[in-house]
């Protein structure tokens, strides 16, 4: 129930009166004093409702404008009311001046204001069984106000009111308030509920009030209650303990027998007599009030003022670029989330970073809530479309590739230019993760898996042998994996050196040798979570096994939905003889393998694809001498380049392009056509469109094709020159006599698929070649993963007496020129000794 007085204040500029009477919870301004701008309401206390008197003095547009900025109710006459209702305004937002309300008004949710009391029977009829507030305006005395306050809310100018017990020629608001209270308690006290204000609205406890304590509380604007032990004393909350309270608002319940004190407790103090407790109704400690968003709000404010050095939250406050990057990252992750649990998890992350941004700029949760309240009070709505810069560009529903002639150098350069990858912002996010895992080890892995993957683990590592129930897959899947691993092993075993030691006699008596040794500890990163990627585990693990790596460590995040590892990946790890599986993903998994933790063996090399965070972490650790860890290769978006001529099957070509386009909107898809007629070109375009329309990921395909190209070459040489310039991850040859062009015409490519019956899909899974390949043009200097990727090659030399005689003088001369005397002497001493023994 509202306080039984509505103070009239002459202007919003009268801050003193607003402050004095804000505990009433409502004030009325004349319309002449109000300028309804966008943020008009925000100048007032959060729990103060604003009313405006516009009777006979406002148009419908002006009234709607008042309602839109958050005015709780507008006082109007009946004509103004009807016009506003016709304009679509809700009746509940009006206080209508009436003598005798019409039937239409009586069936509405509007409040009334009258200048004289109604008869008892009319009052009962008009107040809708006490569900409608009726205000009354008059030239009140205190006794008159007390009498009318039983059934009405007196509207009284603030100049005639006082918060004191009594003041000459003024009406005491406390006298009016207590006159409306009732109680059935023998001691005559009133049950009183103590709560906090926005944003927590926490119930602190139950106390008891007397008329005297209420009068004192209103006058002093503090928490004052009645002591039940000492009836002749008032209880000033916190007078001895320091746990004082500021009175924000006073109200009563619908039966007028329970009072609500809304108070602001002193920071760091609770309400309960058990001094460590914030509220009598829970276990929250005094210096950590509330839960959820209110707790986050108070915690972040404390961190802003008192955060220790090294605090992540302080780092966010200090590094605005990092905070902006995290906001964008978390919004993207929320958009990508699918399950109820995943959406809630990602939304919580986004809210945290949004609140950091707000607190950094002086905005509290109560300010946000007030804006929500104001927006909920709007009566006219805009269409609500996104601003142009955020509207998604129309999808290329025609699924057409842009056609470029090789004679147009600028267009060719545009078609073959890959998107720029920005790593600086990503590294700002990755470095804190790396440092956390380095310092906290297993504990950090458990925390970060909970944070990023939504899975709470007891331990971050699954040791071999792996439980059978964690690799429970169908017999069909087992057969597919077994066949694929067999072919991959056969191809990679053939890459092993044909002889254990390769030796060459470079000069008579000088024997140079080279031999291969496996890298001892290798870490294989297999993306997981929502994806099922046993093929990646096979492509990385089988060559490691063939090379003879002693310890194979697999890292893969558990599924958010099940909390478990992908069973197909566990099965592959079992077949590989992996030592363990690190149940983590992202930069944290890479860091754990690079530096080691209590339960993760430090790896000498880390391999495997991943998102931008995985790539950034791999690039970082390979350059950190503390890690002493190498990686397979840099990574970028997946890509395919198809060379096709006029005899190529259009459906085959289209399927190869689309199998790459469905990977993601940033995938690269290029078709180089050799000597194509317009008819053949149209045949290719039609096949792409026909197949794309029926794909489950057709929207992703459409976006990819929107920046994909067909380059028209005149000759095969021209086509291969363009391909070598681009250096594709996958090169597919659908041309006549394709094998004849391999290897002489190919300089730069990750893997080549020769002929019409060699789709990329075969290489991705089961043919035997490796699908972990250089992207983004790195095929110019990197190979795909192969057996040698898991080996290091050691050289040795044996120099005999004859050999030293043959090369000794050359060595000494070169050492002399370079000024390395000890080098020269190392040979000279030996040659002198040989001469002495002759």
UniProtKB/Swiss-Prot annotation:
Q: Which reaction does it catalyse?
A: 1-(5-phospho-beta-D-ribosyl)-5'-AMP + H2O = 1-(5-phospho-beta-D-ribosyl)-5-[(5-phospho-beta-D-ribosylamino)methylideneamino]imidazole-4-carboxamide; 1-(5-phospho-beta-D-ribosyl)-ATP + H2O = 1-(5-phospho-beta-D-ribosyl)-5'-AMP + diphosphate + H(+); L-histidinol + 2 NAD(+) + H2O = L-histidine + 2 NADH + 3 H(+)
Transmembrane regions: none
Region entry Phosphoribosyl-AMP cyclohydrolase, spans:
1-271
User: Which residues does the annotation say bind Zn(2+)?
Assistant: 660, 663, 764, 823
Provide a Gene Ontology MF annotation, just one: ATP binding
Q: Which UniProt keywords apply?
A: Amino-acid biosynthesis, ATP-binding, Histidine biosynthesis, Hydrolase, Metal-binding, Multifunctional enzyme, NAD, Nucleotide-binding, Oxidoreductase, Zinc
* Span list, region Phosphoribosyl-ATP pyrophosphohydrolase: 272-360
What the entry lists under CDD domains is as follows: Histidinol_dh (cd06572), NTP-PPase_His4 (cd11546)
The pathway noted for it is: Amino-acid biosynthesis; L-histidine biosynthesis; L-histidine from 5-phospho-alpha-D-ribose 1-diphosphate: step 2/9; Amino-acid biosynthesis; L-histidine biosynthesis; L-histidine from 5-phospho-alpha-D-ribose 1-diphosphate: step 3/9; Amino-acid biosynthesis; L-histidine biosynthesis; L-histidine from 5-phospho-alpha-D-ribose 1-diphosphate: step 9/9
| Cofactor comment | Binds 1 zinc ion.
For this entry, list what GO says about its biological process.
L-histidine biosynthetic process
One Pfam family here? Histidinol_dh
Q: Which family does it belong to?
A: In the C-terminal section; belongs to the histidinol dehydrogenase family.
- Please give the name of this protein: Histidine biosynthesis trifunctional protein
């Amino acid at each position: 129930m509202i306080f039984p007085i509505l103070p009239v204040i002459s202007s919003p500029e009268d801050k003193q009166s607003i402050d004095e009477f804000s505990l009433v919870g409502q004030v009325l301004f004349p319309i002449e004093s109000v300028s309804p701008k966008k943020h008009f309401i925000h100048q007032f206390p959060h729990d103060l409702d604003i009313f405006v008197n516009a009777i006979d003095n406002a148009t419908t547009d002006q009234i709607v404008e008042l309602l839109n900025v958050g005015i709780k109710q507008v006082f109007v006459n009946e004509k103004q009311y009807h016009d506003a209702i016709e304009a679509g305004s809700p009746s509940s937002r009006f206080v209508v001046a009436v003598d005798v309300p019409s039937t239409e008004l009586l069936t509405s949710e509007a409040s009334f204001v009258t200048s004289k009391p109604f008869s008892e029977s009319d009052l009962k009829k008009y107040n809708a069984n006490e569900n409608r507030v009726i205000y009354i305006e008059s030239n009140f005395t205190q006794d008159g106000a007390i009498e009318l306050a039983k059934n009405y809310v007196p509207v009284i100018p603030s100049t005639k009111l006082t918060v004191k017990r009594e003041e000459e020629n003024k009406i005491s608001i406390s006298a009016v308030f207590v006159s409306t209270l009732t109680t059935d308690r023998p001691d005559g006290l009133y049950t009183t509920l103590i709560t906090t204000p926005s944003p927590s609205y926490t119930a602190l406890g139950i106390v008891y009030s007397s008329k005297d304590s209420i009068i004192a509380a209103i006058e002093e604007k503090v928490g004052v209650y009645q002591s039940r032990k000492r009836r002749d004393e008032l209880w000033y909350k916190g007078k001895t303990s320091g746990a004082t309270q500021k009175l924000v608002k006073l109200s009563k319940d619908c039966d007028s027998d329970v009072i609500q004190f809304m108070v602001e407790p002193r920071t760091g103090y609770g309400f309960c007599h058990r001094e460590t407790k914030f509220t009598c109704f829970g276990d929250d400690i005094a210096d950590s009030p509330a839960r959820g968003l209110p707790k986050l709000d108070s915690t972040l404010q404390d961190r802003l003022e008192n955060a220790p050095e090294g605090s992540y939250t302080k780092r966010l406050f200090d590094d605005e670029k990092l905070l902006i990057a995290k906001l964008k990252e978390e919004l993207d992750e929320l958009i990508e989330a699918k399950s109820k649990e995943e959406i809630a998890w990602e939304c919580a992350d986004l809210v945290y970073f949004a609140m950091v941004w707000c607190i950094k700029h002086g905005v509290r949760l109560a300010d946000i809530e007030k804006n929500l309240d104001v927006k909920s009070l709007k009566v006219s709505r805009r269409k609500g479309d996104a601003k142009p810069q955020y509207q998604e560009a129309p999808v290329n529903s025609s699924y057409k590739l842009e056609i470029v002639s090789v004679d147009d150098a600028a267009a060719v350069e545009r078609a073959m230019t890959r998107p720029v990858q920005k790593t600086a912002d990503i590294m700002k996010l990755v470095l804190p993760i790396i440092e956390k895992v380095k310092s906290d080890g297993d504990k950090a892995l458990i925390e970060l898996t909970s944070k990023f993957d939504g899975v709470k683990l007891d331990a971050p590592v699954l040791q071999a042998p792996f439980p059978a129930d964690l690799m429970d897959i169908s017999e069909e899947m087992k057969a597919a994996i077994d066949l694929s691993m067999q072919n991959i092993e056969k191809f990679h075993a053939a890459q092993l050196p044909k002889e254990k030691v390769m030796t060459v006699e470079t000069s008579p008596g000088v024997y140079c040798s080279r031999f291969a040794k496996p890298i001892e500890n290798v870490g294989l990163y297999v993306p997981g979570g929502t994806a099922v990627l046993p093929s990646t585990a096979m492509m990385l693990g089988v060559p490691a096994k063939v090379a003879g790596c002693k310890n194979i460590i697999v890292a893969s995040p558990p599924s958010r939905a099940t909390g478990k590892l992908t069973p197909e990946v566990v099965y592959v790890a079992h077949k590989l003889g992996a030592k363990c599986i690190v149940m983590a993903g992202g930069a944290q998994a890479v860091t754990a393998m690079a530096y080691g933790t209590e339960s993760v063996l430090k790896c000498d090399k880390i391999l495997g694809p991943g998102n931008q965070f995985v790539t950034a972490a791999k690039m970082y650790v390979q350059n950190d001498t503390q890690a002493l860890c190498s990686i397979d290769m840099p990574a970028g978006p997946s890509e395919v380049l198809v060379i096709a001529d006029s005899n190529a099957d259009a459906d085959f070509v289209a399927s190869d392009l689309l199998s790459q386009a469905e990977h993601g909107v940033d995938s690269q898809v290029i078709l180089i056509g050799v000597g194509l007629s317009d008819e053949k070109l149209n045949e290719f375009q039609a096949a792409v469109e026909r197949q794309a329309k029926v794909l489950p990921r057709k929207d992703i395909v459409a976006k990819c094709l929107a920046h994909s190209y067909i380059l028209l070459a005149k000759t095969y040489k021209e086509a291969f020159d363009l391909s070598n310039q681009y250096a594709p991850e996958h090169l597919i040859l659908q041309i006549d006599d394709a094998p004849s062009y391999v290897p002489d015409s190919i300089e730069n490519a990750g893997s080549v698929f020769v002929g019409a019956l060699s789709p990329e899909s075969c290489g991705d899974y089961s043919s035997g070649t490796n699908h972990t390949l250089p992207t983004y043009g790195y095929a110019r200097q990197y190979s795909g993963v192969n057996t040698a990727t898991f080996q290091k090659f050691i050289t040795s030399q044996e120099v005999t007496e004859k050999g030293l005689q043959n090369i000794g003088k050359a060595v000494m001369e070169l050492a002399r020129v370079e000024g390395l005397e000890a080098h020269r002497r190392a040979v000279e001493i030996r040659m002198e000794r040989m001469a002495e023994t002759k």
